Amino acid sequence: MQEFVEFSSNNAFLVSGLFASALAVIFFELRIKTRNISSLSAPLAVQLINSGATVVDIRDADKFSVGHIGSARNILEAELLKNPENVTKKNKQALLICDTGARSAECATRLRKNGIDNIFSLKGGIAAWQEQNLPVVSD
C-alpha cells in the first residue's frame, strides 16, 4: 500500500488522468443505458441479422463502398431521420451501423423517440465487426 501512495504522489497527473478516464467511461456507459438503447455486440448482431433484421449502414457512400455488411442498405442518417418508415416495417427489427457505434446509437435514440422500438445499434460500429473477423463486402 505504501508503494501505491508513493507512486500516486510521484505521478499525480498520471493517476488523475486514469481516474478521469475511468469516470468518463462509466459516465458514457450509464448514459447509453439510461437512453434505453440496445447496443449489440458483434456476435449478438449476427444473431439479429440471421433472424431477418433489416441492416442499415448510415455511413457515407464512400465508406460504405469500401466495406459493409453484406445485407446492409446504405441510408444516410439525415434521410433515415426524415423517413423512418424506410428503416423497417412494424414489428421487424433493424440494426444501425456506423464507424464506431456512436452515431448509430444517437440515431437509434431519435428513432425510438419517433416510435420505432425494435431498433438496435452495433456496439463499436463496423470497426468492432471487423475486429471480430466477421465478413464485409465491398462494391
Predicted regions and their residues:
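Rhodanese-like catalytic fold shared by cysteine-dependent sulfurtransferases
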Residues: 1-39, 43, 48-51, 61-93, ...
